[in-house]
């Protein structure tokens, strides 16, 4: 089942959207340890932002925190999941089952709650036909089923062709791990993940003694280097 768009009561800023999954991960960690409450100061210390920023971000999800008592961990996880759309079902296809693609689909952290891996594609005859993560890798010449998200894990030289194929399959959200900017029609969202760029940014800060050299989870996840996380 593919997800269908629905309206949100309040539009969240891009920095807030970037921080919310980190808050959710922190809350899930508390839950795993048997804890039921977490406050904005504790979240902020682990995330590397101020308590004020945390409260402002979470205020956009409605009123559910208790002054002096913090947030119920279960409610916090559910509110963030709803805000980010994790309470719906998403079908995901991955194109490029080389080292990176294989590692991603085999990772327990790759798919968010509600996401379902439905198809894998590659052009390598040595890869096509193999079963990975419970799915048989199909040749890229096969039709791509309609899905919510397409993930590109190919070399840069193949990225545009793959993006075109995903768009033709009526996929309007693309996560691109290939080191290549792709052109897509209006209405299609592309998010780029380029480890070499992240490493260059990190090396700059290391060499100049600036930027995200410490702090919390937002820094260690590499998010702070590419997003203005301390802003609103």
Can you annotate each of these PLM segments?
Residues 37, 41, 46-92:
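HTH-adjacent hinge/linker in prokaryotic transcriptional regulators
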């Amino acid at each position: 089942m593919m997800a269908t768009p629905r309206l949100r009561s309040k539009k969240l800023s891009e920095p807030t959207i970037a921080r919310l999954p980190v808050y959710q991960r922190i809350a899930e960690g508390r839950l795993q340890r048997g804890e039921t409450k977490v406050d904005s100061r504790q979240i902020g210390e682990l995330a590397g932002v101020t308590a004020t920023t945390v409260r402002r971000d979470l205020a956009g999800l409605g009123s559910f925190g208790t002054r002096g008592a913090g947030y119920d961990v279960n409610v916090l996880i559910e509110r963030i999941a709803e805000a980010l759309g994790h309470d719906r079902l998403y079908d995901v296809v991955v194109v490029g089952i080389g080292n990176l693609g294989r590692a991603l689909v085999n990772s327990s952290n790759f798919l968010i709650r509600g996401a379902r891996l439905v198809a894998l594609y590659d052009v390598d005859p040595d890869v096509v036909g193999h079963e990975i993560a419970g799915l048989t890798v199909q040749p890229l010449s096969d039709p791509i089923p309609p899905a919510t998200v397409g993930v590109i894990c190919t070399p840069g030289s193949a990225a545009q062709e793959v993006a075109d194929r995903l768009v033709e399959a009526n996929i309007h959200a693309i996560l691109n791990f290939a080191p290549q900017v792709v052109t897509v029609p209006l209405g299609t969202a592309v998010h780029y993940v380029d480890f070499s760029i992240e490493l260059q940014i990190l090396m700059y800060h290391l060499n100049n003694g600036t930027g995200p050299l410490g702090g919390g989870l937002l820094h260690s996840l590499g998010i702070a280097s590419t997003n203005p996380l301390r802003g609103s």
